[in-house]
Curated annotation (Swiss-Prot):
GO terms for molecular function: sulfurtransferase activity. InterPro entries: LarE, NAD/GMP_synthase, Ni-pincer_cofactor_biosynth, Rossmann-like_a/b/a_fold. SUPFAM superfamilies: Adenine nucleotide alpha hydrolases-like (SSF52402). The lineage of its organism: Bacteria, Bacillati, Cyanobacteriota, Cyanophyceae, Synechococcales. This is Uncharacterized protein slr1717. Belongs to the LarE family.
Amino acid sequence: MLESKLENLRQFFGELDRALIAYSGGVDSTLVAKVAYDVLGQNAVAITAVSPSLLPEELEDAQAQAQWIGIAHELVQTNEMANPNYTANPENRCYFCKSELHDTLQPLALALGYNYVIDGVNGDDLRDYRPGIQAAKERGGRSPLAELQISKLEVRQISQLLGLPWWDKPAQPCLSSRFPYGEEITVEKLQRVGRAEIYLRRLGYNQVRVRSEQNLARIELPPEQIQQFVQDVSLGELVQTFQNFGFLYVTLDLEGYQSGKLNRVLTK
């Protein structure tokens, strides 16, 4: 099954002369970039959008991973923070983010002779609330993992099969996803959340989210790590550090980390 899906992915790129990959450095777009490069070689390029919602560490990872693959890698600046429809953080915020991404990449792709902007949306994403997918479709974007019904688990399994060292890399959506819908997003808030998550990663907690609700930080960890976290971490030092970052209050979510938790309000 995995081999057949990998072969389907190779065939997808085999039908193209060139491929431009919207490359975040996550496990999904990294698999897409790897297979595109294996099939097309120098006719494949990965482009990463740089904005305040991208952690500097994630950019460094993307650069290192692209170098490991061998694919040409370029950076572009996106300016979604200048769009009040985005910074107001409505329920369809991701639509405006992906619109900015594709409106930036599509003219570049056409100028360089690429017919499509190709992303790492996977089959599971189609079953979640992802308004950004619609923005990509409206602009002619292609999502081979979704088109071939390759799930997140299969992405990881195929990545492991191909020997990609980061096949089990934790998901790392943009920092704007840390805020409840309706709370305005600012560069300062993004930086505050970013610093807090980097601090926790350096303590050894890689699968972590710092949800920001006004002046309150809510830490989410995998449920099985919560008890150990409370035992091992100096809570007083943690609170002081977070307050230095700009938070007034620091809490630990006892339910633990769950992807898309802030989307619960959409079903009520």
